[in-house]
From Swiss-Prot:
<dbReference type="InterPro" id="IPR002218">
    <property type="entry name" value="MnmG-rel"/>
</dbReference>
<keyword id="KW-0963">Cytoplasm</keyword>
<dbReference type="InterPro" id="IPR047001">
    <property type="entry name" value="MnmG_C_subdom"/>
</dbReference>
<dbReference type="InterPro" id="IPR044920">
    <property type="entry name" value="MnmG_C_subdom_sf"/>
</dbReference>
<dbReference type="InterPro" id="IPR004416">
    <property type="entry name" value="MnmG"/>
</dbReference>
<dbReference type="Pfam" id="PF13932">
    <property type="entry name" value="SAM_GIDA_C"/>
</dbReference>
<dbReference type="InterPro" id="IPR036188">
    <property type="entry name" value="FAD/NAD-bd_sf"/>
</dbReference>
<dbReference type="InterPro" id="IPR040131">
    <property type="entry name" value="MnmG_N"/>
</dbReference>
<comment type="similarity">
    <text>Belongs to the MnmG family.</text>
</comment>
<dbReference type="InterPro" id="IPR020595">
    <property type="entry name" value="MnmG-rel_CS"/>
</dbReference>
<dbReference type="InterPro" id="IPR049312">
    <property type="entry name" value="GIDA_C_N"/>
</dbReference>
<protein>
    <recommendedName>
        <fullName>tRNA uridine 5-carboxymethylaminomethyl modification enzyme MnmG</fullName>
    </recommendedName>
</protein>
<keyword id="KW-0274">FAD</keyword>
<keyword id="KW-0520">NAD</keyword>
<dbReference type="Pfam" id="PF21680">
    <property type="entry name" value="GIDA_C_1st"/>
</dbReference>
<feature type="binding site">
    <location>
        <begin position="284"/>
        <end position="298"/>
    </location>
    <ligand>
        <name>NAD(+)</name>
    </ligand>
</feature>
<dbReference type="GO" id="GO:0005829">
    <property type="term" value="C:cytosol"/>
</dbReference>
Length: 642
């Protein structure tokens, strides 16, 4: 990869120079392009096919455990995913609704066509953003810095920064049984030349694998023998700016199960599986395994739940969630027809596995800029993640930092949230600190400060930052300010209302909740009781605030003690986060560090003491030594400056 690449550079140079060129129009690419353009950067989104912008390549769903938290963070920063989901969602459910607020998660089944249309509409109406249909074959580099992108026909787009969001297209190989073919996904050509160019970088390249199930014609399915899975009532929304009126028609999903016959057929044909024959070298997602992998790994289970999900309102295609497979087509047809309701199923598209290139994310800066090439940013599956939501949030961050690097921003020259600020911060820190050898998926369990990182308060955590960055428009900002003002006003009102065992408010409270007061308390403090919700307090005090405002007040009251304790831990960690480690820090010169620790620190080059403390094998004693060394260096420098 250099400025001396051969045939491609013989083409024309496009007359307009850009601040940011984004390669790839998937979930990472669209959020990257929109973020950069919202910040005022002249941005180009380069895609091999404009018709597939925002395409849901696998399951037609957004959100879920840990994932909806990321979607809400994208939304709080002005991104497109949540609003597109509200416009396309054909079933909404809140998962873990009976558990604590930290792990509750909204999941939406989406109409593929409506979702793609919503994303494309947003892209086409975004100022400062141009679209261009053509694949990228090369990234030109001068003096160690990305400076242009060359398309398949040799068109050169000059740019200050490049954001690469290639998904599964880099060196993509599709597997169905023992047959394989080159492809970025079914029906799309892979990016071969760009993959070859990228391998010239001094970055460790790996191979990962993902897969998708067969699609089924709903007209050949007997839903009467399946369990019906309806959406929630009242309907949830995904975006802070969304509302129920945006939602299209709502539909049911269904549940069936595999059985011993299903498993016997799959076991019988494992020798024809590329996963078990050794044809596939890439590691697949641990938390979304293929059906053949599930049956092999969980041999003691005689049944697995399969969710039958509609792909949209205007199509008969169904997505059978839980039977991703790369077995031959004849085996797919045979095992699918063993399940209740699918005995006569017609497959419209076979399932397949896809193997693709990714790059070790430990070679990225916290901004998602590569350490090897300046002004080149990676986002999405190229960094070893899996999932639309993980891709989208990385794309937004890469787009933000690419834009910032081209601007003289008085507020900040780069931005990456801390682990206590956002799941995005957790994701990036995990990737750049630990790397990954398998597709990385977000879970709430990955966040040590998850009481603070709830999906319901993503706007309180990030919208003000988004406003400073230029990501949040006036409409969203005004809505956020009104919400915060409403929360403050209502909280103050409740603190001024006193209930006693004998006054009218106290009697109403007991009648509403069945709880007897033994002493006086404010309406605000009554929310601390486990069995009392904001709706109860609203009923007896005449509160008239939006549902999300009431929810926020209730959560803040009930979790106040836990949050305060967690905040103490965060304050301690912030001291380490604020201690920068120079990029050229000489770890060998620190007396007392073991060779193993020196090697790990040299390999990862942590940006802060906090990041260093999270590297496996780096001890608290080592962190103390590093801190002492930095203090000595700071004192020595101060003495020289006198």
């Amino acid at each position: 990869m250099s400025s001396t690449s051969t045939s491609n550079t013989a083409g024309i140079t496009y007359p307009k120079a850009y601040d940011v060129v984004v390669i790839g129009g998937g979930h990472a690419g669209t959020e990257a392009a929109l973020a950069a353009a919202r910040m005022g950067a002249q941005t180009l989104l380069l895609t091999h096919n404009i018709e597939t912008l925002g395409q849901m390549s696998c399951n037609p769903a957004i959100g879920g455990i840990g994932k909806s938290h990321l979607v809400r963070e994208i939304d709080a920063l002005g991104g497109a995913m949540a609003l597109a989901t509200d416009k396309a969602g054909i079933q909404f459910r809140v998962l873990n609704s009976r558990k604590g607020a930290a792990v509750r998660a909204t999941r939406a089944q989406a109409d593929r066509i409506l979702y793609k249309a919503a994303i494309r509409h947003t892209l086409e109406n975004q100022p400062n953003l141009d679209l261009f249909q053509q694949g990228a074959d090369d990234i030109l580099v001068e003096n160690g810095k990305a400076c242009a992108v060359v398309t398949a026909t040799g068109i050169i787009f000059r740019t200050k920064t490049v954001v690469l969001t290639s998904g599964t297209f880099l060196g993509g190989v599709i597997h169905i049984g023992l047959d394989n073919s080159k492809g970025g996904r079914a029906g799309d050509q892979p990016s071969i030349k760009l993959a070859e160019r990228l391998r010239e970088l001094k970055l460790p390249v790996g191979r990962l694998k993902t897969g998708t199930p067969a699609r089924i014609d709903a007209r050949t399915v007997d839903f009467s023998v399946m369990q019906t899975q309806p959406g929630d009532t009242p309907l949830p929304v995904m975006s802070f700016m969304g509302n129920v009126d945006m939602h299209p028609e709502q539909v049911n999903c269904f549940i069936t199960h595999t059985n011993e016959k299903t498993h016997d057929i799959i076991r019988k044909h494992l020798d024809r599986s590329p996963l078990f024959s050794g044809t596939i070298e890439g590691v697949g997602p641990r938390y979304c395994p293929s059906i053949e992998d599930k049956i092999h790994r969980f041999a003691d289970k005689n049944s697995h739940q399969i969710f039958i999900e509609p792909e949209g309102l205007t199509t008969h295609e169904l997505y059978p969630n839980g039977i991703s497979t790369s077995l031959p087509f004849d085996v797919q047809l045979e095992f699918i027809r063993t399940m209740a309701g699918l005995e006569n199923a017609h497959i419209t598209r076979p399932g397949y596995a896809i193997e693709y290139d990714y790059f070790n994310p430990q070679n990225l800066k916290p901004t998602l800029e590569t350490k090897s090439i300046d002004s080149l940013y990676f986002a999405g599956q190229i960094n070893g993640t899996t999932g639309y939501e993980e891709a989208g949030v990385q794309g937004l961050l890469a787009g933000v930092n690419a834009a910032l690097s081209t601007q003289d921003n008085p507020v900040m020259d780069s931005w990456t949230p801390r682990r206590d600020q956002a799941y995005l911060g957790v994701l990036v820190d995990d990737l750049i600190t630990h790397g990954t050898k398998e597709p990385y998926r977000m879970f709430t369990s990955r966040a040590e400060y998850r009481l603070l990182l709830r999906e319901d308060n993503a706007d309180q955590r990030l919208t003000e930052i988004g406003r400073k960055l230029g990501l949040v428009d006036d409409t969203r900002w005004q809505a956020y300010q009104q919400k915060m003002e409403s929360m403050a006003t209502e909280s103050a009102r409740l603190k001024d209302l006193w209930a006693t065992p004998h006054n009218e408010l106290g009697k109403k409270f007991t009648e509403q909740t069945g709880e007897v007061l033994s002493k006086e308390a404010t309406a605000y403090d009554l929310l601390k009781r486990p069995n009392v919700g904001f709706n109860d307090i609203a009923a007896v005090t005449g509160a008239q605030v939006a549902a999300d405002v009431g929810e926020q007040i209730e959560i803040s009251v009930k979790y106040a003690g836990y949050i305060d304790r967690q905040q103490e831990d965060i304050d301690q960690m912030k001291r380490l986060e604020n201690t920068q480690l120079p990029a050229d820090f000489d770890y060998k010169a620190v007396s007392g560090l073991s060779n193993e620790i020196v090697q790990k620190l040299n390999d990862i080059r942590p940006a802060t003491l906090a990041q260093a403390s999270r590297i496996s094998g780096v001890t608290p004693a080592a962190i103390q030594l590093l801190g002492m060394t930095l203090k000595k260096q700071k004192k020595a420098k101060a003495a020289l400056d006198i």
